[in-house]
Structures are given as structure tokens and as C-alpha cells.
Amino acid sequence: MSITKDRSSPSSTISSNYQSPVATHSTKNKVNIAKMHPDKTFAKILLHILSENKKSKDYYKKINSNQDGHFTFKMKPGISLLDYLARILKYLKIEYSTLIIAMIYIDRICKEKVFLNEFNIHRVMLISIYMAYTYNEDCIYDNKYLALVSGLSKSEMLSLEEDFLDLIDFRLFVSEEIFEQYKKYFFRDILDNNN
């Protein structure tokens, strides 16, 4: 399954003209919840954005500038994005709606010039999921527990949370209209395979 599926979708290169990969997608199909694989879909969307970023001529220059502060590792993590996501989902028991909200948050911080790359994509994903989880569900886990699950220290988690909230200007609210737009995009591969 490909994210693009022969559709003309905008480039997800993170720059001042960043456009969400959701922006041009629309569908009238209904979601078949029994056939969902939200973890794989979520990871594929992030990997698609990452692959689009790699096409940018400024990609390696932006990696070397280390402009993303606490989001950026000094070395590439030794765990794949999908394995890291699977670990988070295993211990946090997250609803698919939370992953959709996390995707909205990732778009918001990318619009604020966070350039997704191999050095920051794990942390951007982690903090976006955690903030969506905190906002969307009855959060029973604290930063200490999430630090244990994520492999980061509690102070790193607090720093990520502060940076994240600053970047999105504390805009955690997601309207129903925006949520539905992202939900349709999120399940596009599943819907395409059912047709």
C-alpha cells in the first residue's frame, strides 16, 4: 500500500510553504473499523513525510543545523519508527482517534518549521501522541511512566512537552471538521483496499 496511490498530492517538504498531506484528500466512503491497522497507517504517513523531506535540497543542511532543540537526537535511534510506535501503543493502549489527533499536532508543528528527519521523527511522534493522549483520553499515565516506555528521562519528557506546547502555541483543541478531514486521510489506504 502506498500513501500516494497515484494521486497528485502536495509535497510534504517542511518549509515556509509546508502543506499538510491531508490538504487535498477527500472521500465519501465509510470507515470499516474492523479492518483498521492504525499503528501501521500512522507510521506510514510519517515515513511518507520523511521520504518527501529527503527530496528537499535543504534536507541535510537542516539536519546539521540542529534547529529543533530537544526533538533532535545526536545519533539516529537504533529502533525503527514502526517498532518504537508499536512499543508506545503496547504500553499506552491508545485509541485510533488519539493517533488522528497526534497526526494533526504533527502537522501543526511542521507548519512551525520543525523539519522531520531521522534524528527527530521518533521524538516528534512520541510527544505528539502523548499530548493527544493527554488531551483526548482520561490520561492515567504521567511523564515518569512515559519516560520509562519511551527510553527518555523524565526531564527530557518535560522539555519535549514544553517545546511542543510552545511550537503549537498551546493550540490543543481540534475541531470536529478538521478531525473528520484527517480521519478520512488516515484511513485512505484501508478504504482504497476495500473498493
Residue map of PLM features:
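Contiguous, well-ordered alpha-helical segments that form the cores/surfaces of helical PPI scaffolds
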Residues: I100-R108, H122-T134
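Amphipathic alpha-helical interface surfaces
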Residues: T98, I121-V124, E156, L160
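Channel- or pocket-lining gating/hinge segments that regulate access to a cavity or pore
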Residues: K144-F187
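Extended amphipathic alpha-helical regions
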Residues: Y133-N136, Y185
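Short conserved catalytic/interaction loops centered on acidic-Pro-aromatic/His motifs
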Residues: F115-I121, Y135-S150
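Residues that form ligand- and interface-recognition hot spots within folded domains
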Residues: L46, I129-T134, S150-S153
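Short alpha-helix boundary/capping motifs
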Residues: S128-M131, E156, D192-N193
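Acidic, Ser/Thr/Pro-rich regulatory low-complexity segments at or just upstream of the first helical elements
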Residues: M1-S97, I101, Y105-F115, L158, ...
